From Swiss-Prot:
EC number from the UniProt entry: 1.14.11.67
Family, similarity comment: Belongs to the JARID1 histone demethylase family.
Feature: compositional bias, Polar residues: 197-210, 1490-1517
Catalysed reactions, as listed in the record: N(6),N(6),N(6)-trimethyl-L-lysyl(4)-[histone H3] + 3 2-oxoglutarate + 3 O2 = L-lysyl(4)-[histone H3] + 3 formaldehyde + 3 succinate + 3 CO2
Keyword Phosphoprotein (UniProt): yes
Protein name, UniProt field: Lysine-specific demethylase 5D
Pfam families found in the cross-reference section: ARID, JmjC, JmjN, KDM5_C-hel, PHD, PLU-1, zf-C5HC2
Residue ranges annotated for the JmjC domain, each copy included: 458-624
Entry annotated with the keyword Ubl conjugation: yes
Biased composition (Basic residues): 1428-1441
Transmembrane segments: none
Compartments where found: Nucleus
């Protein structure tokens, strides 16, 4: 490339092949197949099948190697020439005691070599100066014009290059008459070269190989010297023209400092533009521009005069031959000659100090050839891991990016830039040519010590295994016994980025194959063999300096040249990137080179095939001309293969025969020439037993085998017969022939090869005669098959003739198979495609043209005659259309049996298909036929589109299409009606159905519409029937009709009315449920309204209650023993209700008797065998705290059931003592099994009945409610009659008087100390003790002494217990029994009546007060009161904390914390709300359901009013009564 052209253009890609698995099985065969294409490029790339992935078999832990060191810019030929030139010019100045500094021009180091070459090409220095063409020189160096760079280049050339050129040409003894130039600018910055010889550099650290670092090293440090004490140094001021002596390396030191000397070597030649003011200097060129600076190591001394004459004669100037002026004589340190300083060119003004050599020594030193270039070995040994770490680190640091992200194109351009750069030194390492036997191959090897897996064994024997390929049967190298490293034995390569392999061809011009096991790509460049000599010529032309000293430079694998440079000179170059798992093949004499893109591992080996033999012979002649050593003897290889011809592959045998013939002819010619020279002596020599260095020609270095010329007098050498005149000067009689075979033995070997080679020719002649029918006789199939078997058995090559034979056999077999298909019958022909008539005739012609005698040809002729006869009949039938369909079908069946496709059969097929289709259409559309579906019609239309057109078919197809369009349109309408949200009325559906009656197609949506209309009509009829019946319809019937009506896709006006009725009925039932049912009740409304069917069975009743409480019991409609149908008859329901009342009464009486017989839990001891009561919790109630139900007489835990509250009785006042009317206290207890509902008042029930009368719907619950109301009113009438009797009225009047008396008495006081004693002591307390305490005045707390709000209602009630006396009335049995029966019947009613309460007071007053029950109730109420106070305090604390938290969180909290506080605050508020709601519900239900009658208990009304105040105040009568203590007995029951 021209200087400055740094842009690299990638060459075209080489061929890439991807063999199939079948092709991949024969490696050398596949390479031979692609050779005609790939050989034109020199290299090719092969991608194995994707599944072919051999395992990596190298022992990674033991793999250690020492890489080579590669300095990139020394690899490229032109760059190396430049560096060698710099070495020479640097040596030129170094010999004179100076060092070279390379100037910078335009901020780039000046290319001195290119400048020198261009000056020579332009005619030389004098011509350029004369023609003023320095600007052209700058232009050719690619410097920008217009900056006066030409003058600057001229200055640098004159100062640095021109003196060296003068010394090289020997013109240093001639004066140069050029004139000095004026007004020159000052030099640019210079950088020292200081380049030692490359091969003399000892390896050191990785970074020390940089040439640039050495060339750009700083100037030597000056040496401190005491100048004041050295008179010689004082005199050294200026040496002739040029700058001051800055390169002397000396500087004055301070007097106070110790003297020490720094040796600086070498000194410097400093080139400057400035001229000095010396007046006595010469005007020669070198005097103007050079100042030679002496070295400080040694000081040159003048020769002193000696008294001896012999010394005097030696002090003579070699120029003028005079010895005078000895003070001006210079002594040469190289040859000891003397020169006057004024006789030199240029003359020197004074004697220089330091080393000095004369011009003759300088010229001799510069003329020495450079040492041969080669790679150095690194000092560090690597493992794969350590080398990989180093390589990846170097690449990532160099490109400043991850190694896998560096583009290959960028890296390729950077590589060629680096190898062409003289100022940038990049050094890499390459683990190349590593012998596999030391560390193992990358492929599995069969003879390895390790046990191979089945998969590894498969790869170990694969032909693509590089250990196997060189020794395959078709390979030539398998006949070489020695393991030739790199050729027959693979070499391993471990590369890093920029590590390169230079332009080269393989030894003996053999093939090579390279496999990249893993790692980053390897970039290859290849040149075909036809351009190999052209490449050598171009490289010699561009770099003659290298090839003059090393003619075999390209064989040393140390030289690169840019592919763009080669391509610019007409050399065809291709490239490729070899990725992991890919092969690269190089062909014989194909030059190739490349470099690695990064860290990778490759393996390579050579192989030789039969087609290589001519190239191998030409290579030996080429080596002979270059005097290069051979790797093996080509003649020995040929003779060894010829000695065993039967073991050779046939292709190889043919090629060896040709080469052997040429070799024998050449040997005869050479021996004849030897005989003509007069050499007659000869002796046999087994050359193969001699070492190669003992049988090499001393002239051309060729390894001899067939013969050699030796001399008795010169036993140390021999020559090949091509150089018989170069052995020695001895007489021919003293020379003798050393031969391996005689001339008679060689033809014998050639004949054996010929037999092996001609065996194929004999076979080929037989095949040729058979295939060409040259003798007029066709061979039988068996004879042709025998020829093919012979080729397979004798391993004949896969030649064109063999392929023709195989093709012929394949055609014969195909014809026989077709004939058998024709004549073997219809069944055998069903699976095989039919032949056309044309194909039948072609088959007949083919059978006649084949070179094989086939007796089946007669059968084919018979079939052809039958087909032609059938054609005539078919044409006659088609000509007389319309023919009978049966006739057409029979003709078609006969044609199918022929096994041949006749053109007329196709027409018959069309006619039959048309007739069949038309029949199907008629049958589908016939009025009497069953209507077909849309799918059938569409199928007919699709079939009609496939058959051939005719007028009748087209008409039927159009009608069918129109019918299908109409049907699909009505189907869409029906679908819309079925799926639309807005339902259509029945009239619309009827209209759609009427329109589709005449369509002869079954329409699914229309059918669904019909069914929906039918169901709608039936639904309307059902609605009319139930609406016009004798009774209102039942709710269940209406709900069923509504559910059915909603599912119908028809708009029904009656549906909306029914939905309204059902909604109203549900609303009434929900209202009734809220009125009767407790919250979370386990009973249904109907169960509550009806009499309890199992009232007499305690166990059944209790188990059912527990099952319902657990959600396990499901009630049915048989509450009254009626079925669902009987519930629809009002009369049956009333009769069943009456019977249920009687059963309930009988059952409760039986239950009371049973439970009364059970022992009381309050008794001191219980009999183990006696039956006991069981609480709802499943345990036996015992001890204090057990309560007995007033209805069923069973016992329960007070804490397991809801109990009445005594505080719901009238409150005491400060002036009266109504609490002493104990018979009015609410001590009545009904268990949850007896009290199943809220028991609303009769007025509420009557309101529900009024609403029920307005419903046009019958509900079982409504009728049950009516029965319950009638039962309650009936009981109320009987109770009123009983209470209105004279005896009972008198008793009631007496009770009223007692109450008035109690109200007139002052309020009793109670002591705080003994207030709770009766509760704590239980039933054992003595009333007299309590009364005694009451008389003690010290412990009495008067109402005036009580602090407001601190009185305790519980303590007050407890203190009144001792004062309770009774009975207050005497009830005769005649009065008591009816009242108790009424009381029992009233308790069975799920209704609250005032008469019930009045009867309860009478019965209570007629018996002593039940102090045990009162104490139990007080204890339970006290326990509940304490729990309520605890909940109240917790609630109050939460409210306060909430306020504090809200106030604190308002200030400086972030949004997230604020939301969290709000969430917690809302949780607290919801909890508070639930607590307040809980208490409010209890209070409301207490006030709603347990308000006593004002007629009989006037005090209760005031008590009720006083309890409705939730907040206690100082003016309240009893401030300690909290609202949550007003929980009623009814509320506790529902909780």
């Amino acid at each position: 490339m021209e200087p400055g052209c740094n842009e690299f253009l990638p060459p075209p890609e080489c061929p890439v092949f991807e063999p199939s698995w079948a092709e991949f099985q024969d490696p050398l065969g596949y390479i031979a197949k692609i050779r005609p294409i790939a050989e034109k490029s020199g290299i090719c790339k092969i991608r194995p099948p994707a599944d072919w992935q051999p395992p990596f078999a190298v022992e990674v832990d033991n793999f250690r190697f020492t890489p080579r060191i590669q300095r990139l810019n020394e690899l490229e030929a032109q760059t190396r020439v430049k560096l060698n030139y710099l070495d020479q010019i640097a040596k030129f100045w170094e010999i004179q005691g100076s060092s070279l500094k390379i100037p910078n021009v335009e901020r780039k180091i000046l290319d001195l070599y290119s400048l020198s070459k261009i000056v020579i090409e332009e005619g030389g220095y004098e011509a350029i100066c004369k023609d003023r063409r320095w600007a052209r020189v700058a232009q050719r160096l690619h410097y920008p014009p217009g900056k006066n760079i030409g003058s600057l280049l001229r200055s640098h050339y004159e100062r640095i290059i021109y003196p060296y050129e003068m010394f090289q040409s020997g013109a240093n003894h001639v004066q140069c008459n050029t004139h000095p130039f004026d007004n020159e600018v000052k030099d640019k910055e210079y950088k020292p070269h200081s380049i030692p010889l490359r091969q003399s550099v000892q390896p050191s650290k990785f970074s020390s190989y940089s040439r640039r670092a050495k060339r750009l090293q700083p100037d030597p440090e000056p040496t401190e010297e005491d100048i004041e004490k050295n008179p010689e140094l004082k005199k050294l001021q200026i040496y002739g023209p040029g700058p001051k002596m800055m390169g002397l390396g000396l500087m004055a030191k301070d007097k106070d400092k110790t003297v020490h000397k720094k040796v600086t070597c070498p000194p410097t030649v400093t080139v400057k533009d400035e001229q000095s003011g010396g007046g006595n200097v010469s005007s020669t060129l070198l005097k103007q521009h050079l100042s030679l600076e002496p070295c400080t190591k040694t000081t040159m001394q003048l020769r002193k005069n000696h008294s001896s004459a012999q010394f005097i004669d030696s002090y003579i100037c070699q120029v003028c031959s005079r010895g005078d002026e000895d003070d001006k004589l210079l002594f040469c340190d190289g040859c000891d000659d003397n020169y006057h300083i004024f006789c030199l060119l240029p003359p020197l003004p004074e004697i220089p100090r330091g080393i000095w050599r004369c011009p003759k020594c300088i010229l001799a030193e510069c003329k020495q050839p450079p040492e041969a270039f080669g790679f150095e070995q690194a000092t560090q040994e690597y493992t794969l891991q350590s080398f990989g770490e180093m390589a990846d680190s170097f690449k990532s640091d160099y490109f400043n990016m991850p190694v896998h992200m560096v583009p290959t194109e960028l890296l390729e351009k950077e590589f060629w830039r680096l190898v062409s750069s003289i100022e940038e030194d990049v050094t890499v390492e390459y683990g190349a040519d590593i012998h596999y036997k030391e560390f193992g191959s990358g492929f599995p090897v069969s003879n390895s010590k390790q046990n191979l897996s089945p998969e590894e064994k498969e790869y170990a024997t694969s032909g693509w295994n590089l250990n196997v390929m060189p020794v395959l049967a078709q390979s030539v190298l398998c006949h070489i016994n020695a393991d030739i490293s790199g050729m027959k034995v693979p070499w391993l390569y471990v590369g890093m980025v920029f590590s390169a392999f230079c332009w080269h061809i393989e030894d003996h011009w053999s093939y090579s194959i390279n496999y990249l096991h893993w790692g980053e790509p390897k970039t290859w460049y290849g040149v075909p063999s036809l351009a190999a000599e052209h490449l050598e010529e171009v490289m010699k032309m561009l770099t003659p300096e290298l090839f003059d000293s090393q003619p075999d430079l390209l064989h040393q694998l140390v030289t690169l040249m840019n592919p763009n440079t080669l391509m610019s000179h007409g050399v065809p170059v291709v490239r490729t990137n070899q990725c992991a798992g890919e092969f690269v093949i190089t062909f014989p004499r194909a030059y190739h080179s490349g470099f690695n893109q990064g860290y990778n591992f490759a393996e390579a080996v050579n192989f030789c095939t039969a087609d290589w033999l001519p190239a191998g012979r030409q290579c030996i002649e080429h080596y002979r001309r270059l005097r290069r050593y051979c790797v093996f003897s080509h003649e020995e290889l040929i003779c060894k293969m010829a000695a065993f011809p039967e073991t050779l592959d046939l292709n190889l045998a043919v090629a060896v025969h040709k080469e052997m013939f040429i070799m024998v002819q050449e040997e005869r010619r050479l021996r004849k020439a030897l005989l003509e020279k007069g050499v007659t002596e000869a002796e046999r020599e087994a050359f193969e037993l001699l070492p190669d260095d003992e049988r090499q020609c001393i002239k051309c270095k060729t390894t001899c085998f067939l013969s050699a010329l030796a001399c008795y007098d010169c036993p140390d050498g021999l020559v090949c017969l091509s150089h018989i005149n170069d052995l020695c000067k001895c007489s021919s009689s003293r020379q003798y022939l050393r031969y391996r075979y005689t001339l008679d033995e060689l033809p014998t070997m050639l004949h054996k090869l010929k037999i092996r080679a001609e065996s194929f020719d004999t076979w080929a002649n037989k095949v040729r005669v058979a295939l060409e029918v040259e003798d007029g006789r066709k061979r039988s199939f068996e004879e042709l098959r025998a020829l093919e078997s012979e080729a397979r058995e004798r391993r004949f090559p896969n030649s064109e003739l063999l392929q023709r034979l195989k093709n012929c056999l394949s055609e014969v077999e195909a014809c026989i198979a077709q004939v058998l298909g024709l004549v073997s019958g219809q069944v055998a022909r069903m699976d095989t495609p039919q032949l056309t008539l044309t194909e039948l005739r072609v088959l007949l012609e083919q059978m006649g043209s084949l070179p094989c005698a086939m007796h089946q040809i007669g059968d084919v002729k018979d079939v052809l005659e039958q087909v032609e006869a059938y054609q005539d009949e078919a044409r006659e039938a088609l000509a007389t259309l319309p023919s009978s369909p049966g006739l057409l079908r029979s003709l078609l069946e006969r044609g199918q049996q022929l096994g041949v496709e006749v053109p007329e059969a196709h027409q018959l097929q069309q006619q039959v298909e048309q007739a069949q289709w038309l029949d199907e259409v008629k049958q589908a559309l016939a009025p009497s036929a069953h209507r077909g579906s849309l799918v059938i019609m569409q199928g007919l239309l699709v079939m009609g589109a496939k058959i051939a057109s005719s007028p009748s078919v087209d008409k039927a197809r159009a009608e069918l299409q129109e019918l299908l369009t109409i049907a699909e349109r009505w189907e869409e309408k029906a679908h819309f009606c079925l799926e639309a949200r807005q339902k259509h009325p029945p009239a619309t559906l009827e209209a759609i159905i009427r329109e589709t009656e005449n369509i002869p197609v079954h329409l699914p949506n229309i059918q669904a519409l019909k069914e929906a209309l039918t169901k709608a009509q039936a639904w309307i009829a059902d609605v009319d029937e139930i609406q016009n019946g004798d009774h209102y319809p039942c709710l269940d019937d209406l709900e069923g009709l509504v559910a059915v009506g909603r599912d119908l896709p028809v708009g029904l006006e009656e549906l909306r009315q029914l939905e309204l009725q059902v909604l109203t009925a549900h609303s009434w039932r929900e209202k009734a449920s809220k009125t009767f049912l407790k919250k979370n009740s386990c009973y249904t409304l109907l169960e509550v309204l009806c009499p309890c069917a199992d009232a007499g069975s305690d166990s059944t009743k209790r188990s059912r209650w527990m099952e319902k409480a657990l959600g396990l019991y499901q009630c049915d409609t048989e509450l009254l023993g009626l079925s669902a149908q009987d519930l629809r008859d009002p009369g049956s329901l009333i009769v069943a209700f009456k019977e249920g009342e009687q059963k309930e009464k009988e059952g409760i009486l039986q239950l009371r008797r049973t439970n009364s017989a059970k022992p009381s839990p309050l008794a001191p001891s219980l009999m183990a065998s006696s039956p006991t009561s069981i609480c709802v919790c499943g345990q036996v109630p015992a001890g204090v705290g057990a309560l007995q139900c007033d209805l069923c007489q069973d016992w329960f835990h007070g804490q397991c059931v809801s109990v009445p509250h005594l505080l719901t009785s009238p409150k005491p006042s400060l002036t009266s003592s109504p609490l002493l009317a104990w018979w009015e206290w609410d001590t009545k207890f009904l268990c949850p099994l007896c009290m199943r509902s809220r028991r609303p008042r009769l007025e509420t029930i009557l309101a529900l009945l009024v609403a029920l009368q307005r419903l046009p719907v019958r509900l079982p619950e409504g009728e049950a409610l009516q029965c319950l109301t009638e039962r309650a009113i009936g009981w109320q009438d009987r109770a009123r009659k009983a209470l209105a009797s004279e005896d009972v009225t008198a008793l009631l009047r007496h009770l009223a008087e007692l109450r008035q008396q109690l109200q007139a008495k002052p309020r009793p006081v109670y002591t705080s100390a003994t207030a709770c004693d009766p509760i704590r002591e239980g039933s054992g307390n003595n009333i007299s003790k309590v009364q005694g305490l009451l008389e003690n005045g010290d412990s009495v707390i008067s109402p005036e002494n009580m602090a407001p709000g601190k009185g305790s209602d519980l303590e007050l009630l407890s203190s009144l217990l001792p004062q309770l006396t009774g009975p207050v009335l005497e009830l005769p049995e005649a009065i008591r029994a009816p009242l108790e029966e009424l009381m029992m019947e009233g308790d069975l009613l799920e209704v609250t009546l005032d008469e019930n309460h009045s009867i309860w007071q009478l019965l209570q007053a007629g018996q002593p007060p039940d102090l045990d029950r009162i104490r139990t109730l007080l204890e339970l109420e006290k326990f509940e009161h304490q729990g309520s106070r605890t909940r109240s305090r917790a609630l109050e604390r939460r409210r306060r904390q909430q306020k504090v938290d809200q106030g604190r969180n308002v200030e400086n909290l972030v949004q997230q914390e604020l939301q969290s506080k709000r969430a917690r605050s809302s949780g607290i508020m919801s909890q508070v709300g639930r607590e307040e709601e809980h208490y409010q519900e209890k209070a409301d239900r207490e006030n709603m359901f347990l308000t006593p009658s004002t007629d009989h208990s006037p005090s209760l009304k005031g008590n009720q009013n006083s309890l409705q105040h939730k907040d206690s105040g100082s003016s309240a009568a009893c401030p300690s009564l909290m609202p949550w203590l007003q929980l009623s007995y009814s509320d506790e029951q529902q909780l």
